[in-house]
């Protein structure tokens, strides 16, 4: 099949590109390179089944494809708060453009949504049926509400125009090709440790997150797109729950550094806990994560060690 991946030069988009090329598909990788990097796709430039298109998903595009994966949007607070208006435009206009293309060419279209649609949840763990607790006017709202609006658009195009949609809600994901400057907790901790710096925890470190290794997540994407029964949304994440203190201690242990842990003020609207209920993915997709946190951290640390040395 001929597949369009928006955000295809990003952390997850580039890994999805690798997987779909291995599966025998032709890939059009679209990215404006705001947070994506040619470094992530440099190894693919000579592949005859791969095409890179530098284009912003908020601008209309016409292509002939069988499937569309919409991954285009800054996904870390550092990046999505840098230009909040651009962030929400990317989620909303990007969704409209992908859905319009899917309608025209009769393609199946996939939306990479987020656990941020649950906000600071009052239900734990979070099932897909939970509507969330989101501040609509806070500093994170450009991302949270943009993704919620994209889900609305996907379901309205599905109901009104019969567009064939799939939606996943991504929980914290990590692995090689994360940017060292993206401000996410795993990359922050690892980079600080490898540089011999103090590890910064915001708040007292009791807040929890669940960390899914990229290869598990990509497998969930593909399983959802390849079946004809389930539209979504589907939580894709690792239900193993860790405090920020536990994560920092693991990183210090696995890097073998002498970094100390220091604390700074907690940012506004930072969720206190986040853990996916993955029963739907397990029963309908036969999916569950395989990579344990320590195993994934070792691979990610090795990547960053090489990256920083270069």
Predicted feature descriptions by range:
Residues 7, 16, 97, 172, ...:
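C-terminal substrate-binding subdomain of Rossmann-fold SDR/epimerase-dehydratase oxidoreductases
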């Amino acid at each position: 099949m001929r597949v369009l991946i928006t955000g295809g030069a990003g952390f997850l988009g580039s890994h999805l590109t690798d997987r779909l090329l291995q599966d025998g598909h032709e890939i059009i990788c679209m990215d404006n390179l705001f947070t994506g990097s040619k470094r992530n796709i440099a190894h693919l430039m000579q592949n005859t089944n791969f095409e890179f298109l530098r284009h912003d998903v908020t601008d209309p595009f016409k292509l002939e494809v069988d499937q569309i994966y919409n991954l285009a949007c800054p996904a870390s607070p550092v990046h999505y708060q840098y230009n909040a208006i651009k962030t929400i435009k990317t989620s909303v206009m990007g969704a409209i453009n992908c859905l319009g293309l899917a309608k025209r060419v009769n393609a199946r279209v996939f939306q990479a949504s987020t656990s941020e649609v649950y906000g600071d949840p009052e239900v734990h763990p979070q099932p897909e049926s939970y509507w969330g607790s989101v501040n609509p006017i806070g500093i994170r709202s450009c991302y949270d509400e943009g993704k919620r609006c994209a889900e609305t658009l996907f379901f309205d195009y599905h109901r009104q125009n019969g567009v064939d949609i799939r939606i996943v809600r991504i929980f914290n994901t990590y692995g090689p090709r994360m940017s060292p400057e993206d401000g996410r907790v795993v990359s922050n901790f690892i980079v600080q440790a490898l540089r011999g710096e103090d590890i910064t925890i915001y708040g007292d470190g009791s807040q929890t997150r669940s960390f899914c290794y990229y290869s598990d997540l990509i497998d969930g994407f593909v399983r959802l797109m390849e079946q004809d029964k389930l539209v979504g949304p589907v939580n894709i994440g690792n239900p193993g729950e860790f405090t920020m203190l536990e994560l920092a201690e693991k990183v210090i242990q696995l890097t073998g550094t002498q970094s100390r842990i220091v604390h700074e003020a907690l940012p506004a609207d930072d969720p206190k806990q986040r853990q996916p209920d993955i029963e739907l993915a397990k029963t309908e997709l036969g999916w569950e994560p395989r990579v344990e946190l320590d195993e994934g951290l070792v691979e990610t640390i090795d990547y960053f060690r090489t990256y920083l040395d270069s």
